[in-house]
A protein has these predicted regions:
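Conserved catalytic cores of phosphodiester-cleaving nucleases, focusing on short active-site segments
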Residues: 23-46, 54, 62
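Protein kinase-like catalytic core scaffold
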Residues: 21, 33-35, 83, 98
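Domain-level recognition of nuclease-like catalytic cores that cleave nucleotide substrates
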Residues: 72-106
Length: 106
């Protein structure tokens, strides 16, 4: 979550955790859409992409946690989306971030 992203997103929660699961970032877009974002990091030489680590079982846990978040915050009527942020370290010491919007659905 960088300062550039703060122009687009407003952070609602970070590492939101319940017994059923955890959501790395919960953000709100200017249009009101809630974005539940799973952040995954892999080394450049990994045989799998970061997004591939978000298995169907992990997706179910995120979905259930998101449902409970919406209930607890009285926001069940809000539009929402589930994104994955793929983070890969570069040789320069910087990071490459690729956002997959709508990576999975409820």
């Amino acid at each position: 979550y960088s300062s550039a992203a703060s122009d687009v997103y407003k952070r609602q929660a970070h590492n939101y955790s319940l017994l059923v699961g955890e959501i790395d970032l919960i953000l709100r877009e200017p249009d009101g859409t809630l974005v539940f974002c799973e952040v995954k990091t892999r080394q450049p030489d990994s045989l799998t992409t970061p997004a591939e680590a978000v298995t169907p079982a992990k997706q179910r846990r995120i979905l259930r946690t998101a449902q409970l978040y919406l209930q607890h915050t009285n926001q069940s009527d809000q539009p929402m989306r589930f994104d994955v942020a793929e983070v890969t370290p570069l040789d320069s010491g910087r990071w490459m971030v690729h956002i997959i919007k709508g990576a999975f659905t409820a």
